[in-house]
């Protein structure tokens, strides 16, 4: 079982990656938007009675930081590809930009697609044009993500589930990897 997990969040600028992290780690919501360049934090989480150190790496969505983003990918155990339901371009960019960047740096690391700012479907000025869950699930299948989740950092809906799923996905991937290693080392050969 992993004792520490590195979780990297990617996606366009202003889709709510930092707000999601702040809500999860401090149970508050940042009122002012502050663009991220590169930030990481950590929290201890319990999964099935086992304490795991969860490292959270927030990346800049701005293309100006494309050259330094790969530094945050090193040895990641799981990636959260985030888009805002109120920003259709951020949704399209998961398929047109982010999955390619993630797969070229982390070809075997599990990816989860995370729809953020779901509160905008109910109260936002863009509610009629918001990306719906069916479109999000289809995108997750298209990019071969391990899962699709929705959340709102503002209303604190689905936030905990996003990180529980990230931890469980990373742990399950490590178990599969260890099982493959065990069987490849201990193969029986009939001569």
UniProtKB/Swiss-Prot annotation:
Q: What is this protein called?
A: Rho-related GTP-binding protein RhoH
Kindly list the residues that the UniProt entry marks as S-geranylgeranyl cysteine lipid attachment points.
188
- UniProt free text on domains: The region involved in interaction with ZAP70 is a non-canonical immunoreceptor tyrosine-based activation motif (ITAM).
- List, alphabetically, the InterPro entries matched: P-loop_NTPase, Small_GTP-bd, Small_GTPase, Small_GTPase_Rho
**Biological role:** Binds GTP but lacks intrinsic GTPase activity and is resistant to Rho-specific GTPase-activating proteins. Inhibits the activation of NF-kappa-B by TNF and IKKB and the activation of CRK/p38 by TNF. Inhibits activities of RAC1, RHOA and CDC42. Negatively regulates leukotriene production in neutrophils. Negative regulator of hematopoietic progenitor cell proliferation, survival and migration. Critical regulator of thymocyte development and T-cell antigen receptor (TCR) signaling by mediating recruitment and activation of ZAP70.
Enumerate the CDD domains for this protein.
Answer: Rho
Q: How is it modified after translation?
A: Phosphorylated on tyrosine by LCK. Phosphorylated by FYN. Phosphorylation enhances the interactions with ZAP70 and SYK and is critical for its function in thymocyte development.
GO MF annotation list: GTP binding; GTPase activity; protein kinase binding
